[in-house]
Amino acid sequence: DTPSDWSXFTRYTYK
């Protein structure tokens, strides 16, 4: 999954 906001990508689980 690619988060729209890479500025806060840490909020998402990097896959």
Curated annotation (Swiss-Prot):
Its main location: secreted. Transmembrane segments: none annotated. This is Protocetin subunit alpha. GO terms for cellular component: extracellular region. The lineage of its organism: Eukaryota, Metazoa, Chordata, Craniata, Vertebrata. Keywords: Secreted. Expressed by the venom gland. It is found in: Secreted. It comes from Protobothrops mucrosquamatus.
